[in-house]
Amino acid sequence: MLIIETLPLLRQQIRRLRMEGKRVALVPTMGNLHDGHMKLVDEAKARADVVVVSIFVNPMQFDRPEDLARYPRTLQEDCEKLNKRKVDLVFAPSVKEIYPNGTETHTYVDVPGLSTMLEGASRPGHFRGVSTIVSKLFNLVQPDIACFGEKDFQQLALIRKMVADMGFDIEIVGVPIMRAKDGLALSSRNGYLTAEQRKIAPGLYKVLSSIADKLQAGERDLDEIITIAGQELNEKGFRADDIQIRDADTLLEVSETSKRAVILVAAWLGDARLIDNKMVELA
């Protein structure tokens, strides 16, 4: 497994792979890898000849400096996990390598609408940072496919739109959420939970499933469903942050023509902001 830290070396390897006619898959990550990331890697390996995993804690997508400062950097352990998975290439650049003149004056990619609604409204600049780094990685790695987790539902929708709008010839693969046995969605942020909070955390998925059950039973008073769900989260020890029920295909308000809904939930548990989602077919 190659570990590359500079743009010239990465370009050199990508040129070689292209000359050899290899099908390349990219898995963009911020490191601190868990089994959910490994599921992305496995999906990439099944679909391509060569798998490139990027590990870069992107300062442009953090709306709070303290979050950036405390985000775990575990490059050695991450590379050991990826080596066991037989990943071909790890791209682990420094911030200086990606943003040589800093982030303030760096060219950015913005996806109007999707970047400022829902999760984007509570995290200003976050999705602009995501679309900028992902587009830069697409230009550098030139993958045939790229794999992203469905846990970050809005992020996946944003990347699909960016790819369509910018004409990237890349297949975007959404990989289903991987959960612990108790239902908690795997996330790097779960590491912020205390032992006691970890026992409470599966309650998020229980509330999510309760909303889904109501929708499947034909309930359509979305405001009431959301209000009750927020109360349930708070009673379980969370601080409900945002609960939305949206059209799964557009992320707009659910309408009579909506065929699928996505339930998007964000809640604080101690210092960890947990997010989860669930899709529901609307009869």
From Swiss-Prot:
It is found in: Cytoplasm. ATP binds at residues 30-37, 149-152, 178, 186-189. Its EC number is 6.3.2.1. It holds the Pfam family Pantoate_ligase. Belongs to the pantothenate synthetase family. The reaction proceeds by a bi uni uni bi ping pong mechanism. This is Pantothenate synthetase. It comes from Escherichia coli (strain K12).
